[in-house]
């Protein structure tokens, strides 16, 4: 007797679970920009309708803020639906960082635009070729203030850069762990935060001891600015010197090179780009000072190229005096003040460009 056995049922195949994808789609490259434009246009229409209905002015600040909020909401929701939660969070954070950057740029762009728009009225050849001697009302220029700014700042740099650089070399190369180095660092940190007027009073008191009260000299202004520059040069140069790898120093010592020559030939060339940037930052910090120069260098309407004889005027002081001592017509004085401010900004920009060029030329070459 043959017994037929039914075949065993085959096991039900277990469905293979696919790993979840990080993103289920991707927004087109133009989509974020389209959402930004739509947010700006739609909120602008709403604010315009509100302004017309309420007979009020257009709220520019509110429009920009609401546009940013609407954009963040839209880009997060749409990205979450199309690309997934991870990408949506990434786009949300990117939007916040971008908006923060734009907000930080608003004051800079506003200041630059205001100075350029108002300073071009007197940005002419007469402004750069004449002084204010015997000038009342319209006309005149700021050639005496431009030369005063350059000479006083140059003298301050000549005084402060060697002192600051040598101090930073001592702190990094010779004073590591010493008590005197800690004391110098503490004093430098304190000097970094002193008000500029204190530096002016110090320079005035120093020269008044030898030349009597009431003295005003260009070199006094240079001393005051040097006091403000030294701590900035020290701190920036110190940080750059500490970034030089110790392996470079040890390799030089292994070849029998003395310490001072290692500093000159290895350490300083390696850090020259950062040191130059720090020096230019210190110059940019002091070139616009007004209070210490009012006390030390004073102000004058004539051109004076001698730092050790007579008063000198700088562009910040020229701007202050023109704005505060307006005559008839007042527009002429205000225009000269704006032109001086624009000239000062251009000088700072040129100095920074020169610093970048110097840093690029003298930076250590990489590669073979």
Predicted regions and their residues:
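Cytoplasmic-entry segments and transmembrane alpha-helices of multi-pass inner-membrane transporters
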Residues: 26-27, 90-95, 163-203, 230-239, ...
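Periplasmic/extracellular loop-to-transmembrane helix junction in inner-membrane transport proteins
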Residues: 12-25, 49-60, 76, 80-99, ...
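Transmembrane alpha-helix signature in integral membrane proteins
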Residues: 63-71, 140-169
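Generic hydrophobic transmembrane alpha-helix motif, especially the helices
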Residues: 189-225
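Transmembrane alpha-helices
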Residues: 159, 236, 257-297
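Interhelical loop and adjacent transmembrane-helix boundary motif
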Residues: 293-345
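Short helix-to-coil transition segments within interhelical loops
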Residues: 173-174, 241-245, 251-261, 265-271
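C-terminal transmembrane helix and the adjacent membrane-cytosol boundary/short C-terminal tail
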Residues: 241-242, 246, 253, 324-368
């Amino acid at each position: 007797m043959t017994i037929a056995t039914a075949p065993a049922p085959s096991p039900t195949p277990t469905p293979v679970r696919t790993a979840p994808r990080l993103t289920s789609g991707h927004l087109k490259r133009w989509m974020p920009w389209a959402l930004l434009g739509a947010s700006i246009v739609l909120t602008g229409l709403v604010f315009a309708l509100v302004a017309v209905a309420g007979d009020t002015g257009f709220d520019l600040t509110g429009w920009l803020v609401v546009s940013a909020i609407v954009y963040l909401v839209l880009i997060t929701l749409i990205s979450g639906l199309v690309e997934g939660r991870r990408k949506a969070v990434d786009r949300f954070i990117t939007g916040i960082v971008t908006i923060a950057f734009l907000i930080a740029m608003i004051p800079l762009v506003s200041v630059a635009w205001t100075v350029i728009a108002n300073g071009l009225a007197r940005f002419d050849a007469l402004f750069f070729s004449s002084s204010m001697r015997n000038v009342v009302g319209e006309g005149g220029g700021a050639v005496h203030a431009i030369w005063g700014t350059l000479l006083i700042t140059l003298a301050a740099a000549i005084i402060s850069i060697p002192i600051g650089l040598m101090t930073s070399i001592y702190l990094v190369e010779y004073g590591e762990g010493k008590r005197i180095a800690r004391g110098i660092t503490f004093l430098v940190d304190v000097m970094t935060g002193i008000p500029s007027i204190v530096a002016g009073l110090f320079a005035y008191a120093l020269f008044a001891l030898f030349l009597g009260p009431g003295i005003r000299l260009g070199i006094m202004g240079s001393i005051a600015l040097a006091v403000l520059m030294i701590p900035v040069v020290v701190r920036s140069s110190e940080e750059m010197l500490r970034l030089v790898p110790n392996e470079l120093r040890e390799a030089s010592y292994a070849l029998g090179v003395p310490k001072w020559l290692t500093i000159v030939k290895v350490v300083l060339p390696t850090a020259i780009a950062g040191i130059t940037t720090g020096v230019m930052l210190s110059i940019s910090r002091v070139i616009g000072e007004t209070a210490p120069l009012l006390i030390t260098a004073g102000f004058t309407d004539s051109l004076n190229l001698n730092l050790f004889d007579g008063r000198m005027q700088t562009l910040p002081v020229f701007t202050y005096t023109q704005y505060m001592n307006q005559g008839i017509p007042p527009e002429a004085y205000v225009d000269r003040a704006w032109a001086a401010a624009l000239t000062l900004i251009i000088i700072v920009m040129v100095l920074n460009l020169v610093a970048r060029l110097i840093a690029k030329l003298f930076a250590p070459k990489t590669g073979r």
